[in-house]
Amino acid sequence: PITVNGDPVVLKNKKEYILVDVLDFYPFDLSVAKGNRLETLINGVSSDFTSPVHENDEVKIYWV
């Protein structure tokens, strides 16, 4: 599993994942902006939605 905003999330059905795939398994509402921009981090490093995600990664997605 990976961790998303502190919650364990199991990714399944694919061999490899990118950050945007996480949204299929973690409920994060992108339809209503709650800040000026969306911050996405993988293991503390700023990332974009095409960044690869691996087992045991820590993902953070939040508005700033």
Model-derived features with residue positions:
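Ubiquitin-like/PB1-type beta-grasp interaction modules and other compact soluble beta-rich domains
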Residues: P1-V64
